Amino acid sequence: MEGQGMPNKDYKIKPVLYKLIKANPRLKHDETVSQIEQIFRRYGFYTTREYPIYKLKDGSERAGRIDLVARKGKFRVAVEYDHHKLIKWKSFQKIIQIKPDVAIAIAGNGEIESNMERALKFKEIMMCRMYVMTLRDKKFKIIFPKYIKQSTATP
């Protein structure tokens, strides 16, 4: 059941998220991704850096590499880290394209609210369980399914 955002699997990722917010955004991109990778490994995940993704024949998806993919059994997490204030659109596209169980988009120097607004404009976000995190603010929020269900529940 990969890619279905299984809520009962939160126990596998919540402790990791609380450690991830302590990563240092002042380091270079590769050094911060290395910190993130070590955190996943401490929690028993197997990791792959610069995980390749390929463009589909119809050209609807993008080719590139995802900063980090962590796996524990059949549970898969995709992580994209952007050093800037806002998470790039292509980062959202890439992590959603591989249909992970959990996607984590991290902005090194941004504010959580502006990154949440940006993520909510990306309709494909509902394809997996998505967390947005900012290292400067030391905060993370779940976007889907919890946040979208709450925000669409009001008339």
Question: Which ranges hold each PLM region?
Answer:
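Non-catalytic C-terminal interaction segments of nucleic acid-processing enzymes
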Residues: 2-8, 90, 121-155
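Acidic-basic catalytic patches of nuclease active cores, encompassing PD-(D/E)XK
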Residues: 3-62, 71
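Amphipathic coiled-coil/heptad-repeat helices and related helical stalk/stem segments
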Residues: 32, 64, 87-91
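Residue-level detector of flexible, active-site-proximal loop/helix-junction positions
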Residues: 54, 85, 137-139
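Catalytic cores of nucleic-acid endonucleases
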Residues: 76-133
